[in-house]
Amino acid sequence: DLVRSRGLGDVYKRQIQLYSVRDILNKVDNKNGKCDPTYTALLKKLANMGYTGVEAANYNNGKFYDRTPQQFKKDVESAGLKVLSSHCTRQLSKEELASGDYSKSLEWWDQCIADHKAAGMKYIVAPWMDVPKTLKDLETYCAYYNEIGKRCKQQGLSFGYHNHAHEFQKVEDKVMYDYMLEHTNPEYVFFQMDLYWVVRGQNSPVDYFNKYPGRFQIFHVKDHREIGQSGMVGFDAIFKNAKTAGVNYLVAEIEGYSVPVEESVEVSLDYLLNAPFVKSSYAK
């Protein structure tokens, strides 16, 4: 219909984080090279709803949802979707933080980057890190992320960090999130702002756009349950300031549900497609 057609055309207009449908995916058996029909059907359902791309959340031992990078790309594209991005990370050990030598972890990242490139990814996003005990450890993490981002860029990908609420705590006397924004190189590290978690952390996304313009290439559009239902996230003001943020892509993520999962992700997309303040595309 006309409303849904706004989500089509540009191949990267509306992404969904596959963690949103984890309860379905977790029941799917993709092992031994056999593609469970439930998995294929789910991807096609998402495409039929009006989603145009996916963000993975299951990279492990060189595979995505037990599929090789090439097979995952093929499965997604066969369903009429595109592969945009993926959540994965490798946290530094106590020994690496103490020594400042994270070369072993960088070896892991080299393989990780190669696998994501083979899967057709544009972005790799680190979805989590613990709150460091010292500012020195946080500084080491920023240097680590800069190096990962540099290696991603050399392979034609971009590297970013996704927040929750704990990044708004202070490490010594510095707000962790602000310190990360100020000590990572914009050339190598972008930030995937999770709008809901910024609000839950008692902060204003728009204030961050104005303080650090252009750093937030992807929005994780999330709410307490279905997108737009709680009224606690000021989506109107957020999207009116999206240009300042520097956003290129929107990724819907639904972590909690008040209706069945498939209905929940569809209702959430409908909100984004119908909201007058959400542009049909942010891709440049």
Predicted regions located by residue number:
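Histidine-centered active-site/metal-ligand motif
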Residues: D1, H87, H162-H164, P186, ...
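Single conserved hydrophobic/aromatic residue that forms the stacking wall/gate
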Residues: D1-Y12
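Histidine-acidic metal/acid-base catalytic patches
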Residues: D10-N32, D36-G50, E172-M193, W197-K284
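Acidic-and-aromatic substrate-binding clefts and catalytic sites of carbohydrate-active enzymes
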Residues: D23-N26, A56-T68, R90-L106, D130-E139, ...
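Catalytic domains of carbohydrate-active enzymes, especially glycoside hydrolases
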Residues: D36-Y59, H116-K122
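Acidic (Asp/Glu)-rich catalytic clusters
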Residues: L43-N48, F64-S85, W108-G120, A143-Q154, ...
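Active-site acidic/histidine proton-transfer and metal-coordination neighborhood
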Residues: D75, K82, S93-F190, E262, ...
